[in-house]
Amino acid sequence: MTQATQIRRIGFDMDGVLLYNPSRIFRALISRSKQAHLFPRKELEFYHPNTNLEKLLWVLVHQSSFKMADGFSDLENFAHNNQVELNIVSARFSCLQADTRKWLKRLNRQQIFTSCNFNDLDEQPHLFKARMIDELKLDYFVEDNFDVVHYLATVQAKTEIWWLSNILDQHIAYPHKFVNFKEVVAALSQNK
């Protein structure tokens, strides 16, 4: 296969990337509080809901992903007009399966995604994403959580990790940083 006809494999996180989620700005605050040791957890250990009440609260918190990201229709056009393989790689825990299925019907309404991969076994999100990036042999992966971006960029030599930033993290330098999803799709369109 020549370089001109090579299919690019691209992966997208769901919450905060494909789905607009204004509460994602709080991730920066949570990350900083972990760095300041305000929480007794490791930097890259994500909370997992265990009790029924915790799972209910987790479902309610994820209602903040309330619409498709601005630029999603641009992604659909991009998918139909380019040699690409698009994949969803979401670390949503299994307690969110019903909501995830609902969103998947809307996100894949034009059958643009080759695969939709969800964290049904409740692995740590960064480890799940690293494993899926390897299995899918992705060329690019778009993520909105900088802690995950930093981890993946460290362990994924063959995959370019793109960061969909937020207003609280604008001071952080990163080579593949975007402020909105429309920018991501525009960059993918130019990056042939």
Question: How should these model regions be labeled?
Answer:
Residues 21, 89, 164-166:
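Generic beta-sheet signal
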Residues 56-64, 113-120:
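Glycine-rich phosphate-binding "P-loop"
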Residues 84, 96-192:
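C-terminal cap/substrate-recognition subdomain and adjoining C-terminal extension
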Residues 13-14, 91-92, 145:
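Short, well-ordered beta-to-alpha junction loops that form the rim of enzyme active sites
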Residues 50-54, 60-61, 66-69, 73-75, ...:
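Glycogenin-like
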